[in-house]
Regions:
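TPR-repeat structural position
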Residues: 13, 20, 61, 68, ...
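Terminal, low-structured helical/coil segments at or just beyond the last alpha-helical repeat
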Residues: 325-355
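Residue register of alpha-helical TPR repeats
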Residues: 39, 43-46, 87, 91-94, ...
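Structural motif corresponding to the intra-repeat A-B loop/turn of tetratricopeptide repeats
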Residues: 10, 58, 99, 106, ...
Length: 355
């Protein structure tokens, strides 16, 4: 189990999964020898959830669901003829939250909300019974937030109410103990609501929510500047703010946020390598960097200043170069094909306009 945690911390999900499976086999063997050894059964359920999260991290959602199901089956067996302990209730709630999140990634929204609502009910019971346990309150807020994300996607009427309740719980947690994990979660809630407001044409309100998200992300990145997840989320927020300020006609802010997103993309390209594949560069970071260079170029062109035009040309060339690198590795990558063609077309138009 300690080895699995080490692999997880080192960003080696496949190694973490393999190590956890070895532990699971050993614990399952002990549990099968004595079905009344519920302590072993609970340990097995915990490891199943850990494996499920590992598979979710590498986007193998079917395997993730399989191990969450296995955890729930173990818990059903443990509590069949016994009142569930607090630990059992927590594991049940965690399993339902995990399943709800994974089903959401698979666009199975109805099923996702069913599991998330089970988790919300179970965490709510734990919070009511043990209000001093801030961990339970956090996971209740997280389950509500994930439910709100699905509700926003499906246009459910209760989306804003659920999201607001999640934010209320998180604000209470932050006021008592401003931990980074609480601030990161509340930033997610503001970001989700901001995207929904954009889709509804409420750009001013969307900017307000996006700036609240950015405020929290900036605070936690001061404490953990090398945290990959914080960097990825901050970069996507800069991209959203770029689009929002573009609509508002605030060119200065557009360029500022373009540069911020690009800077983080360059950092991620170097720091978030695929440790399990000879420390290779991850394709998603190449793609984002190529897009960010292209968007910076596009927005600089609109300024129509010669200095900015020269920088725009360099940005398009860099975007084109990175897309070409992607296509060397994946010739059939449609996004890269389209991105390369777009950057090439932009360079042609720049050449024509300067002739």
């Amino acid at each position: 189990e300690n080895l699995s945690n080490s692999y997880t911390g080192n960003n080696e999900p496949n190694s973490a999964i393999a190590s956890s499976k070895v532990s699971l086999d050993l614990i399952n063997s002990a549990y099968l020898e004595n079905r009344n050894n519920f302590s072993m059964g609970r340990k097995a359920a915990k490891i199943c959830l850990s494996i499920s999260k590992g598979y979710q991290k590498i986007n193998d959602y079917n395997q993730s669901n399989t191990y969450t199901d296995q955890a729930i089956t173990l818990l059903d067996e443990i509590t069949k003829d016994n009142l569930p302990l607090e630990e059992d209730q927590y594991l049940y709630a965690s399993a339902n939250l995990q399943m709800g999140i994974t089903l959401g990634f698979q666009d199975k929204y109805t099923e996702s909300r069913e599991y998330l609502e089970y988790a919300i009910d179970q965490f709510n019971q734990l919070v009511t019974a043990i209000p001093e346990n801030r961990n339970y309150q956090f996971y209740l807020a997280k389950a509500l937030g994930k439910d709100a994300e699905i509700a926003f996607k499906t246009g459910a009427e209760d989306a804003v109410t659920i999201n607001d309740y999640s934010i209320e719980l998180l604000n209470d947690l932050i006021n008592n103990n401003p931990r980074d994990i609480f601030k990161f979660e509340i930033a997610q809630r503001f970001y989700t609501f901001s995207k929904t407001l954009v889709s509804q044409g409420e750009d001013s309100a969307a900017r307000t929510q996006a700036n609240l998200a950015l405020k929290n992300l900036k605070e936690i990145r001061k404490n953990q500047p090398s945290n990959i997840e914080f960097q990825i989320n901050t970069a996507q927020l800069f991209r959203l703010l770029t689009e929002l300020h573009k609509k508002a006609g605030d060119t200065e802010k557009v360029i500022e946020y373009c540069r911020e997103a690009l800077s983080l993309s360059e950092t991620l390209l170097e720091t978030d390598r695929n440790v399990e594949d000879n420390n290779s560069i991850k394709l998603e970071h190449r793609s984002r960097l190529a897009r960010d260079y292209g968007l910076l170029g596009w927005n600089l062109v609109k300024l129509k200043d010669q200095y900015e035009i020269d920088e725009a040309r360099k940005s398009f060339k860099e975007s084109q170069k990175i897309y070409k690198e992607i296509l060397i590795k994946e010739p059939s990558n449609i996004d890269a094909q389209q991105g390369y063609q777009w950057a090439s077309d932009c360079l042609v138009e720049l050449f024509k306009s300067s002739s």
